[in-house]
Amino acid sequence: SGLTGLREHLRRRRATAWARPRQWASKRRDRTLLPDWPLPSPQETGPRHDVTVGVIADEFTALALGYEWRSVPLTPTGWREQVEQTPIDLLFVESAWHGNDDAWRFQVIGSQGPSGHLRDMVTALRDRGVPTVFWNKEDPAHYDESIETARLFDWVFTTDEAMVEHYRRDLGHDRIGILPFAAQPAIHNPIRLLDEAGRPAPLRDVAFAGTYFAHKYPERREQMEIVLAGAHDASARLPHGLDIFSRYLGGDDTYQFPPPWDSHVRGSLTYTQMLSAYRAYAVFLNVSSVVDSPSMLPRRVIE
């Protein structure tokens, strides 16, 4: 309703004081320069659909879909009690490496996938008549690591249209579909960040957020060199220039930005800070490790 929307607007307005420009101008590798975007509570807003879903997903998918349905984040050892306490209408499993806050670490795809816990759960729920869905967002790069997991499910969806025929061939059925990445309007929207006076904060110039791969994805690396070189060269003529947020800052050397990009690295961001970053820049740069898919692209592009 109008009053509900106004209350939500005022709540966000109070919660989103923007960092001072002089703080932004510093080159501290401090991720707190961006505020956490306040998340509306799915419990307060209510799900858009009257469906209860058992879920294994990463934090981004779990958050986005939590506004669409009632989510039950299942665990490897507690799922039986969970579905007895809260009967589910659907099982939705994403190709998550660290599903449900690491409860399913490498058990869906990866070194342990599909694990015995996952096999037992999917089989038991199918026997109960619960429809089961597997969504592979890691296609095409990790198709071979996911196909055995896909065999367990009633329905399989992929982010890459080019892989549909591969699934039909290897699984022997037609219950295959395309489920691309999507934005969640509750959190991915043009509501502006505010300065301390409550006015829309001035936009910074250009940002890139993600990972540098020194050891793989050469075409992606070539894309990065093109777009980052342009932003680097333009930075001298811009008030703020290029800001880079590195996903693996300070970790393995193969994931660190080399010169001259490293001089633009401003730190790492949590996901709620990333939601603020989306709103903070006039331009957000993106590249993709998938270069020949008709449908696959980074989730961040759509968000």
Enumerate the language-model features and the residues they cover:
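Structural motif
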Residues: 89-90, 131, 155, 283
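Nucleotide-sugar donor phosphate/pyrophosphate-binding loop at the beta->alpha transition
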Residues: 133-147, 184-187
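Active-site charged/polar residues at nucleotide-handling catalytic sites that mediate phosphoryl
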Residues: 85-86, 151
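Short beta-strand/loop segments at the ligand-binding rim of alpha/beta enzyme cores
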Residues: 46-48, 125-134
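A conserved, positively charged/aromatic
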Residues: 146-156
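Catalytic-core regions built around general acid/base machinery
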Residues: 116-128
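Intrinsically disordered, low-structural-confidence terminal and linker regions
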Residues: 1-24
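Nucleotide-sugar donor-binding catalytic core of glycosyltransferases
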Residues: 16-84, 95-98, 103-104, 110-113, ...
